[in-house]
């Protein structure tokens, strides 16, 4: 846990694809800006150009290019190694510090009895660090007598340009729910309705009035339903906007903790550029 005064950030959950942070004391707008930046501004690698030299399969050229673009590529090293998307705008694919070559060439003998499924693992990529995260992803079926030859190029891009570059399949911000309760108004019907929330039932059975902070409770729709029906007047659900849960689920292109780190870095750079723009305009003193 990292603490600064009344503010703290705690890693509640972390694995290869998911990170959940408990954030206290920071403004909602600031944390939400990080959440949005995760989806729209953190760069990853994805195929952007595809040249189809030969394709006699049943899959249209446009569909081949589309499927290649959706292949999730490992971008953990690429984000530090290759030039940023805006620096590569208008550049030719031959620019090695902007693009990675991705090629596919396959043919099945006409005399063969069965065809072959081409997967993401069959792609030849010029940079071994930019490899398919899910190599078993099926791309094309090549039947006997068919062939395909594609040369493609991947580059860094951002989710706001196309979702194939978004590093996260999920980026959610949740408030911490607080339950205000009055045991004197809670009948048997109310307790039965709340049976899925043993912590709440225990508080109501203890007697008296009070509040209960439900940290870690992600879904409160059932709780709100009970509050509005069987427990009307006995319980009320509120939310603490200063105690937040930020959950990010990676597509696999980047480690989840790196996604959050890069989102904060991107946000800092935006603020810096904005401050420089304001300074360049100048502010007249009154």
UniProtKB/Swiss-Prot annotation:
| Catalytic activity field | RNA(n) + a ribonucleoside 5'-triphosphate = RNA(n+1) + diphosphate
> Which molecular function term from Gene Ontology is one that the record holds?
DNA binding
Per UniProt, the enzyme's principal EC class comes to transferase
Alphabetized Gene3D superfamilies for the sequence: 3.30.70.20, DNA-directed RNA polymerase, insert domain, RNA polymerase, RBP11-like subunit
Q: So what family is this one in?
A: Belongs to the archaeal Rpo3/eukaryotic RPB3 RNA polymerase subunit family.
Keywords, in A-Z order: Cytoplasm, DNA-directed RNA polymerase, Nucleotidyltransferase, Transcription, Transferase
Q: What does this protein do?
A: DNA-dependent RNA polymerase (RNAP) catalyzes the transcription of DNA into RNA using the four ribonucleoside triphosphates as substrates.
Record GO biological process: DNA-templated transcription
Where would you find this protein in the cell? Cytoplasm
Gene name of the record: rpo3
Keyword Amino-acid biosynthesis listed? The answer is: no
Q: Which NCBIfam families match?
A: PRK00783.1
Q: What is this protein called?
A: DNA-directed RNA polymerase subunit Rpo3
Subunit details = Part of the RNA polymerase complex.
- Phosphoprotein recorded as keyword: no
EC code(s) of this entry: 2.7.7.6
Which InterPro entries does its entry note? DNA-dir_RNA_pol_30-40kDasu_CS, DNA-dir_RNA_pol_insert, DNA-dir_RNA_pol_RpoA/D/Rpb3, RBP11-like, RNAP_Rpo3/Rpb3/RPAC1, RNApol_insert_sf, Rpo3/RPB3_RNA_Pol_subunit
Q: A single GO CC term, please? A: DNA-directed RNA polymerase complex
